[in-house]
Amino acid sequence: MMERQITKYSLAVLAIVFTSCYYDVAEVLYPPTNCVTDNMSYATDIAPILQINCYVCHNEAANNGNVTLEGHANVINYVNSGQLMGAIKHQSGFSAMPQNSTPLGSCEISKIEQWIVQGAQNN
């Protein structure tokens, strides 16, 4: 008789523990994305992304793979050929970039993509 009560209490405690420790809140599980891609500016939005993720290997001095992404005049060549988007989106036929590092986030890719759609201006 005593064993049954202990078992009942144990099951009740376990049920409370497992059901009370978790809750579904959409904002916690799926945080809103605050990726603003309106009116992209090369100087304000794109150059900083390239500087953080690309300049280590693709600057005027290093020029790895004969690719220089320092400055709009250099970047626009890779934009026009499709190489920039192909590389950062890891598309077939392109070297996935950045190599040996974390891929660009979806927001960073969206910003670059929208900047290109908006004319890839040197602004």
PLM region spans:
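Sec-dependent bacterial lipoprotein signal peptides
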Residues: M1-C21
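Aromatic- and Gly/Pro-enriched helix-to-coil junctions and flexible linker segments
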Residues: C21-N123
